[in-house]
Amino acid sequence: MTSQLIIGLIVSVLIGSVSSTVSAASDPTNFLFRKLSFSSEENNQLFRKTIDEADALEFEEAGAKSNSLVANVEADNRIDGLTFARVLANAAIIYAQLEQPKGALELINRSVSLVEEESVFHEDIYPLMMVKAQILIKQGELAEAIDQLRRAQHITHRYGGVYSEQQTDAVDHIANVNTTLRNHLEADRQQLFNLRISENVLGADSIELVPRLEKIGAYFRSRGVSLPYASDATFSETPSLDRKERADIFSQAIRHYNRALTIQESAYGPSDIRLINTLRSLAKTRMAQISGRRYAEDILERVVKIISSNPVADIPEHAVSLINLGDTYTINGNRNASETYLKAWDLLSQTPELTNLRESIFSSVTRISPTIPPYNIIARRPSKTQEGEEIFIRATFSVRPDGRVSNINLIEGNAPVDQKKLIRLWLRTSKFRPRIEEREFVLTEGLTTYQTFQVLEKEPAETPEESSPSPTTLPEKVDETESA
């Protein structure tokens, strides 16, 4: 494994990401019509070259040939409407890849009209609606995109039944769009419906069901992370309801991961290395849950045990499992952290190549909690600052051998008092993977963080104390560098 991949594995288990954007469940080029034939050899060659160039991601060239093919087919009255519709659809897909949504929509609408002349329930309606929906999503026309996705789903129901496997792509898109629109309950419903489809197609205990269970587990983890853990009214007008919703959502995530584990254990046994990805995802979920962090230790201890006893696992993978466990111990205040880090240190001291990797991991401190920086929105510009002047705080601090922060000093800044308190609290509660030199944990001094703030209102406040942090916006930049 490369150093970057290993370091990525180390941090991934501790980070519960939050995504509020629509992620594409498929590439529009997946819906290209690839089996067309024409009486003209010129058109056959244009068609084949269009597909080949699209597959090679050469969309400019594919677009030129596609335009020529559209013109040729449109001028040939011997070609049936359905074939022309498919040629138009291919051209629309290429236009979409060229970031020409207006032209793509015009082409796809012409294609739909031709197909509807055959039947409004024709099978081709499904790919056309999927392509149109993805174009609309990129345009931000999300409500209309859902309408197209629903129509695509309806077509699959007519030909494959309510649990048609073909619809999973459409359902994924519907769920993602609803997440972006903050229709979370509807997004939840769509995610669970996709699980039912997979259960119906694959079987409730099929090993092939594991990827879907893991995907839904990750979805509900992301949902849970998006809700505040704190009960303070600053974050919510209904804190008790939010806490219950958060707990319920994390319970769903954990339940799906546990089910995936049970299926894998039945298929492979309890100590198979193929369980590791699911175990790490479950540990990440427990860490994000916060109230379940102690359980994450047990899960990652199991990962270490599986890897250490498996002859297939290599030394870097074993070291990664120990570092992930050590980081979890550090966050939880478990005294076993130091011993665990040193085991990883020793493993990575066996060859010069491993030693270089060891130094990249342990030669400097690494923030492991909180992974989300402090809020950086203030209500008004402080009265002592000018319009356009940067509002900031610069602080220095040290990281102790146990990964805790000490010697916090706000050395410079013009931000309000509330923000200074926030930065101090953020640093005080931070946990770091400590620096190790010659197998000894050492104090790291002279670290600096620089935090900027954005202003909601342009008018200056009468006093700098009147501002308050926003619970939703993250900082532009937080740098932590060691002084020379």
Go through each PLM region and give its residues:
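Bacterial N-terminal signal peptides that target proteins for export
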Residues: M1-G8
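Surface-exposed, polar helix/loop patches in the mature regions of secreted/periplasmic/lumenal proteins
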Residues: P101-A143, R150, T156-H157, D172
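Mid-chain, structured segments of secreted extracytoplasmic proteins
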Residues: E74, D80-E116
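Sec/Tat signal peptide C-region and signal peptidase I cleavage site
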Residues: S20-A24
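Hydrophobic packing position at a conserved site in alpha-helical tandem repeat units
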Residues: L69, V73, S111, V115, ...
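Charge-biased low-complexity segments
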Residues: A25-R48, F59, G63, N67, ...
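Bacterial N-terminal signal peptides
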Residues: G8-S17
